[in-house]
Structure formats: C-alpha cells, structure tokens
A protein has these predicted regions:
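Glycine-rich segments within core transmembrane alpha-helices of 12-TM secondary carriers
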Residues: 19-44, 176-184, 272-283
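A late C-terminal transmembrane helix in Major Facilitator Superfamily
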Residues: 33, 183, 256-295
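A membrane-interface helix-boundary motif in multi-pass transporters
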Residues: 45-64, 204-207, 288-319
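Extracytoplasmic gate region of multi-pass secondary transporters
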Residues: 123-187, 244-248, 252, 279-287
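C-terminal transmembrane helical hairpin of 12-TM major facilitator-type secondary transporters
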Residues: 202-250
Length: 340
C-alpha cells in the first residue's frame, strides 16, 4: 500500500503538497481502526447466526475482500495526470509546476526530467546515505506506532482493569484513534513553512519532523499522570499517535524529494521493511519485559510489576523520534538528491 500510494502521489502532486496528501491517505488506517469495532463484531455475529462457522472467519474474509475491490478500482481508474481525461488543463499545469519552473533553464528542466527517469537497482539503493536516513527514520519510529496500536488495550486492562470488550475500554480506544486524526493537519505544516520562509521542501519537512518529534516526549508523563485519571495516558498516546502519522507522512515525502520517481516505491518499501523490523523488536521486547516485570515484581521510578515495564517502554517511545531525527539529519544535513 505505502509503496504504490507514495509512487502515485509523486505523479499527481507537486513536492510541497505531497506531505499533506500523504497525511490524508495515512489517516485512512485510523478511519479503519475507528470503524472496525462497530463493523466487524456485528458482521461476525450475523454470520454466526446463519451458521457460518464462528462468524469471525467470514467477517475477516468480507473485510479483506474490500481490499481486492479497491485494488480493482485503482487498476482501472488510476491514470497519470497527463493522460487522465478527468484532469483539466489548469490542474495539469499546477501539478507540473515542478517540471515547468520558469526560473529554470530548459537544460535544468531536462536534467530534472532525466533524473526522475533514472533507474536504480535495489542493491544500489543501499549505497546512498539518503536510503539509510529513511531506513533509520522508519526503524526508530514505526515500532512506537505499532506498540501503541497493539499494546494499549492490554495497558488499559493491566493497569486499570478494563477488559477490551467493556464499554469503557472501547470508548478509550475510540477517543485515542480520534485524536490521531489530527495528523491530517500535520501534513500541511511543511507547505506553510515553505510559503512563509521560502525553504526547499526537504528543509521544510525536516523542520516539521523536528516539531513532530517533540510531541512524543509527552509519553514520559503518561504513566505518572495515569495515577490521577486513565484519560491522561489515553490523550497523550493519541497525541503521540497523531505526531507519528504526521512524521510518517513527511518521511514518505522526503523520499520523493531525494530519489527519482522511478525509485520512490523501492525506497518506501525499504523503509517499510525497516519499520517492520523495528516493530518486531519493540513488540517482542515489550512482551518479554512485561512478563519479566510481572514475575519479578520489578520496580522502576516508583512503579511496580507490569506498570514499571510499561513506563520503561513509554520512555523508549518518547525519545525514539528525536533520536531518529538526529541520525537522519546527520546522514543528510542538507537537501541533496541521490547521485544516481
């Protein structure tokens, strides 16, 4: 999904608008998470009532089938702007502003077009620091998102005693996901920075990502404030989730700033692989830490047992984005397309 969509956005949006458009498609997963609790259980109960197994199997098949329907629509309806009859002349002119900049000579425009058409093999991608910047940015941060996604229901149950099927727990999760929808506005920030400062898209994105990297620091206070109300950690996790989605939208757009269009999907795929590795590490490590904390009644910063384990992971999540940003900035200090 991420690879193909990022490649498509590279065709239909100019550079300064890509982060905003990416934040919109990124928010789709949040909409799905909000819709899942009110659609999948009723479907499962219906299929169970008519004797189709336990109901859950067919419910998942139906939901998964929607993805194939969307894939079919994409394959038949998507066309590049220059051959799409639904794109008018004014829209096409706006989209192609990056390629038709009046301040650039014809030679510069030709060089830019040649760059976008260059082919880079999968293995060659790893010789560029830009690739490793994306790799590190995804490795350090995707695991935080998936930790919050997978472990928050368990956190609510372990710390506050609300089972995931109770109304209170479902309301807390709903509010958390609703807050993450704020990420749509985060995708707009680089455009605002570009318009106000005249910075190049890469510099504007890195400035925006630094701002987004500061919000997860609030996770340091989630556990202590949770002593007063369970709403505090939920709101903080929601804000951190919104910051992650804004960060993610911009890191996808950074790929389009530095790599040829023909290579965008490959680099996004490499970033996705890095994010998967990071997610595996933090989720497996968290599970083992929580088991150890419960078995040994471990103490940390005034917390005992599993709450101590959660506080440790919250601390890791809080600083992950800032560490990732620093490494990315060290690898690619200034805007520099790959020397393909």
């Amino acid at each position: 999904r991420d690879s193909s969509t990022s490649r498509g956005l590279g065709d239909v949006y100019k550079r300064q608008d890509r982060a905003y458009s990416t934040s919109i498609f990124n928010a789709g997963s949040t909409v799905g998470a909000l819709a899942a609790p009110i659609t999948i259980p009723p479907l499962a109960r219906y299929f169970q009532s008519i004797g189709v197994g336990n109901g859950w199997e067919m419910a998942f098949i139906v939901i998964g089938g929607l993805g194939f329907i969307w894939m079919g629509l994409w394959m038949f309806l998507y066309k590049k702007p220059n051959v799409n009859p639904r794109v008018n002349a004014a829209e096409l002119e706006y989209i192609e502003q990056d390629n038709n900049n009046p301040e650039e000579s014809k030679a510069q425009q030709a060089a830019a077009n040649d760059f976008d058409n260059k082919k880079i093999s999968f293995l060659q991608c790893f010789k560029f620091p830009q690739t490793w910047a994306v790799f590190v940015g995804k490795f350090m941060t995707d695991g935080v998102w998936w930790f919050f996604l997978f472990w928050t229901p368990a956190y609510i149950s372990d710390v506050y005693g609300f089972a995931s099927d109770t109304g209170t727990a479902q309301m807390l999760i709903f509010v958390l996901y609703a807050i993450t929808m704020l990420s749509i506005y985060g995708g707009k920030l680089p455009t605002i920075i570009i318009n106000k400062t005249g910075k190049n898209p890469y510099a504007a994105r890195m400035q925006a990502m630094l701002i987004f990297a500061l919000f997860p620091l609030l996770a340091l206070f989630a556990q202590p404030l949770g002593n007063y109300s369970y709403w505090y950690p939920i709101i903080i996790i929601g804000i951190a989730g919104a910051a992650h989605q804004s960060w993610s939208a911009n890191i996808y757009s950074v790929v389009g700033d530095m790599f040829p269009k023909s290579t965008i999907a490959t680099i996004v795929g490499i970033g996705g692989m890095a994010g998967g590795i990071g997610s595996f590490c933090i989720n497996m490590g968290s599970g083992r830490l929580f088991d150890y904390a419960a078995e040994t009644n471990m103490t940390f910063m005034g917390f005992e047992g599993k709450p101590a384990g959660y506080f440790i992971i919250f601390c890791v999540c809080a600083v992950a984005y800032l560490v990732g940003w620093i490494i990315m900035k060290a690898l690619v200090p200034k805007y520099k397309p790959v020397d393909a």
